[in-house]
């Protein structure tokens, strides 16, 4: 085979990565659809320079986290569990309790579940900023407001 006909595979390099900031309003979006789109942006899968083993994703700011909705009857049935590692250390909290106490954690946990189960996911999750209400402290970064339908 002639080597001039074969294109070498492109691998993103650290200096080639340009990170953008995106703003997403979570009001009236379904949790799963929103989380999958956010995970795609954090991983950089929306870019043509995507490389699986390099963190090439962008920053995402999510506002109005308390106004997220779930499909069907999950609002009454969804339970969040965590385990301390000790006997009797299983704690359960319902979606409604979580929404009243920590609404930002709902989106963070959903996105975390859709990220790859690697050490790289921990670094990608640091680029997710979730806030209750319409205000956020990232005005200086000039985040681009996007609709999740366009991703």
Swiss-Prot record:
GO terms for biological process: negative regulation of translation; translation. Belongs to the universal ribosomal protein uL13 family. Signal peptide: none annotated. This protein is one of the early assembly proteins of the 50S ribosomal subunit, although it is not seen to bind rRNA by itself. It is important during the early stages of 50S assembly. This is Large ribosomal subunit protein uL13. The lineage of its organism: Bacteria, Thermotogati, Thermotogota, Thermotogae, Petrotogales. It comes from Petrotoga mobilis (strain DSM 10674 / SJ95). Keywords: Ribonucleoprotein, Ribosomal protein. One of its GO terms (cellular component) is cytosolic large ribosomal subunit. Part of the 50S ribosomal subunit. NCBIfam families: rplM_bact. One of its GO terms (molecular function) is structural constituent of ribosome. Pfam families: Ribosomal_L13 (PF00572).
